[in-house]
Design a protein with these regions (language model features):
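The feature captures the conserved acid-bearing segment of alpha/beta-hydrolase catalytic domains
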Residues: 191-269
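Primarily recognizes the serine-hydrolase "nucleophile elbow" in alpha/beta-hydrolase
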Residues: 164-212
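Alpha/beta-hydrolase fold active-site loops
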Residues: 98, 127, 165, 213-215
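Short substrate-entry loop that stabilizes the transition state in hydrolases
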Residues: 91-141
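PDZ-domain C-terminal substructure recognizer with occasional recognition of PDZ-binding tails
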Residues: 10-52
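A domain-start/cap signature at the N-terminus of enzymes
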Residues: 43-97, 173, 180, 231-236, ...
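Gly/Ser-rich "nucleophile elbow"/oxyanion-hole loop immediately N-terminal to the catalytic nucleophile
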Residues: 89-96, 140-173
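Cell-envelope and extracellular/periplasmic
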Residues: 104-108, 136, 156-159, 171, ...
Length: 271
């Protein structure tokens, strides 16, 4: 690509991230034993969500399942918080899995409901659902950003995580913490999806960086008293070149909207 050799897939993101939208470059491939070169141009990351996205089956050569699946406790000895991960039965160590970190609303953590909502998506789309809890169920505190980061690092030690599909997803107070985590952990988080949550006004939000790109999905109720402030904050993110996708929702997402959110997550690894 652009006369640079590709050794590993991550090289592609690094090379393409060095171009501004609208830049032209060449790509050379070997097709049926013959070299081919074509010209392409870059564009800004789209904010539309595909209505359909084909399931990609794992390669037949993917390693067999040697890891523990199901509901896995994730306990950090130095932290009082509880955490559990849902690892799909379809997990294979040779297949990178996206990671969805669910951050619950204040005082509302229902593990059974979460498993019911996400299990089929985890199996079909190669996702692991990480469910950390606030130390005090009634509310998250800003310092728990560090705890959630540790929990993410812990699950990455045991399972093969697709670094391009690490998403923090929160509702209400959990969504506020999701924004804090996403913008403070730019080296790690590639997507933030919130429902009925505002970007904290004092949060330091840097311009989007091509080599540490971050996509935003925000669902809200247009009749909410917070709607105007939330819209202004999202405009600021767009001005800073973040791809922002917005949806309307009263309360949490409907089942169809969760399906769409999963497709949004699945597009985060696009070039």
């Amino acid at each position: 690509i652009a006369e640079k050799n590709i050794s590993v897939p991550d090289d592609v993101y690094t090379i393409l991230g060095s171009f501004e939208p609208g830049s032209k470059f060449s790509i050379s491939v070997i097709k049926s034993g013959q070299p081919e070169t074509t010209s392409l141009s870059t564009s800004a990351l789209p904010t539309q969500i595909p209505k359909e996205l084909p399931l990609v089956p794992p390669l037949e050569t993917a390693a067999d399942n040697l890891a523990i699946t199901g509901l896995i406790p994730v306990k950090l000895p130095e932290e009082p918080n509880e955490c559990v991960a849902l690892v799909p039965e379809s997990y294979k160590t040779g297949v990178p899995h996206g990671l969805v970190v669910w951050l619950h609303p204040s005082g509302q953590f229902n593990q059974a409901r979460l498993v019911k909502r996400w299990q089929r998506h985890c199996n079909a789309r190669h996702l692991i659902l990480l469910m950390p809890q606030a130390a005090k169920q009634k509310r998250w505190v800003p310092t728990e950003v560090d705890y959630v980061r540790k929990a993410i690092d812990e699950i990455r030690k045991s399972y093969r995580i697709d670094d391009t599909r690490i998403v923090v997803h929160g509702h209400q107070a959990g969504g506020v913490l999701a924004y804090m985590l996403a913008f403070s952990q730019r080296d790690l988080i590639r997507g933030v999806a919130t429902v009925d949550a505002e970007v904290p006004q004092r949060l330091n939000v840097p311009a989007n960086a091509p080599l540490q790109r971050l996509a935003v999905y925000a669902a809200s109720d247009s009749e909410s008293p917070r709607a105007a402030r939330a819209a202004a904050a999202l405009k600021r993110l767009r001005d800073l070149q973040y791809p922002v996708t917005t949806r309307q929702s009263k309360g949490y997402l409907s089942e169809m909207q969760v399906d769409e959110l999963v497709r949004w997550i699945d597009t985060l690894d696009r070039l």
